[in-house]
Amino acid sequence: MATNDQSAPETTVSVAEDGNNSPKDGYDKKCIFCKIVNKEMGTELLHSDEEISCFRDIKPGAPHHYLVVPSKHVGNCKSLGKDHIPLVERMVEMGKEILQKNNITDLEDVRFGFHWPPFCSVSHLHLHVLAPVSQMGFISRQFYRLNSYWFITAEQLIQRLNSLG
């Protein structure tokens, strides 16, 4: 069992009882997205910097389906606070940049959003960037449906975070 050593310096990486690195250090070794960002999976990173990374969704719901994730482990959208608004905004901007690099200029035919817990398959914050929405199939339209209790747009998430005390 791990003990909490009060004399340990603040720079010590905390390790959970099962030996996993704590998400406090920015990496969860059981998280597939942490592995992708750290280039352990062979997934092509379309963008990667200290703050955010972007790669293609493994099961695309639209001709262009990208995931934008924080480069350090951050829990799902339900765990966010008001201080995460700039991160979410930066994730949306990166999604727009990736779409533009792929010649998607009609931003009226795109969707930016998150699955709301418990309907997210990976509990590392990830923004779905889908385009063109008009070419999404029936199942994808349901899976990424606006005004559903399982999917929230980036704009709705920012409004929700702004309303927190």
Predicted feature residues:
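HIT superfamily nucleotide-processing domains
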Residues: 1-165
